[in-house]
Regions:
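Central helical "cap/lid" subdomain
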Residues: 7, 11-12, 104-159, 220
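N-terminal FAD cofactor-binding segment of flavoenzymes
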Residues: 2-46
Length: 270
């Protein structure tokens, strides 16, 4: 869930460039989403894109990251620190970062699983633990996100987005029509196949190729463009349940995140 606000030529643009929406399948998550709706943190974007299937697609009213900021209000969050070592001492954990040490009774790791594996390897003897075998097998899809600011309106139909429309693009959205940007800017998520093909190429050339492709596909005229690469955009396989409790370490270690529960925001929440 990633959003950003930028100013270009004295104009404000806000865009989502990670998860674009979420759905609800369980009562537990549905109850929570209803509460967010009452607080005007989220709203129904649409019931489908090219086809209306009747299932609500929810969006955050001010960008997806804004929802995270609201629900984490009051928590003490340490940012811009890399965990380099994890230790367990009888009844508590100690995490060492490039700046400080942190201690806690429980440890919950929600990073993409390849990063989770590297963290777990810093725990003495954990690399030989059977629990690592399953998560080591999970592979991820890559995604290159192209963000474009526009000097004029796009020609996108309501609700302003297209999903899985061809072999090059997984999702393309006009953030103004979506309702989060005061000026027109488009987010385009390249397909895994195209992202893999272009991943190691020169970034300027990649951007030019993607801009040309999207211009030909939608007949739009971007003024400025940016890229963001998602190395772990989506897991190719999901794990059952909503978390893993590791039997060792006195049941004080848990693995969670969107790889559980269907690779969706709902799975990460539950």
């Amino acid at each position: 869930m990633a959003s950003k606000t930028i100013f270009v030529d004295n104009k404000e643009f806000r865009y989502d460039y990670g998860a674009q929406f979420f759905t609800v399948r369980s009562k537990e998550f549905g109850d929570q989403v209803s509460e967010w709706e009452m607080k005007k943190l989220v709203k129904v974007w649409c019931n489908g894109f090219e086809n209306n299937d009747g299932h609500n697609r929810y969006m955050s009213t001010n960008g997806m990251r804004d929802l995270l900021g609201n629900i984490s209000s009051g928590l003490k969050i340490q940012q811009n620190q890399k965990v380099t070592k994890i230790e367990y001492f009888d009844d508590y954990w100690r995490l060492g970062t490039n700046r400080a040490n942190f201690e806690s009774e429980l440890l919950v790791i929600t990073t993409p699983l390849p990063q989770c594996v590297e963290l777990l390897k810093t725990i003495p003897t954990f690399d030989h633990h059977d629990s690592l075998d399953e998560i080591k097998k999970i592979e991820y899809k890559k995604c290159i996100a192209l963000i474009m600011t526009m000097g004029s309106e796009s020609n996108f139909d309501s609700p302003g987005a297209y999903q899985m429309m061809d072999e090059d693009w997984d999702f393309v959205s006009d953030n103004k029509i979506k309702g989060i940007s005061p000026n027109t800017c488009v987010t385009a998520h390249a397909s895994n196949a195209l992202s893999e093909h272009l991943w190691n190429d020169d970034e300027a050339k990649v951007k030019d190729q993607l801009v040309d492709k999207i211009k030909n596909r939608f007949n739009i005229k971007p003024e400025h463009s940016f890229l963001h690469k998602w190395l772990y955009a989506q897991s190719k396989k999901n794990l059952e349940g909503y978390f893993r409790k590791i039997a060792s370490y006195d049941n004080r270690l848990f693995l969670a995140g969107e790889v559980f529960g269907g690779s969706k925001i709902e799975g990460a929440y539950l």
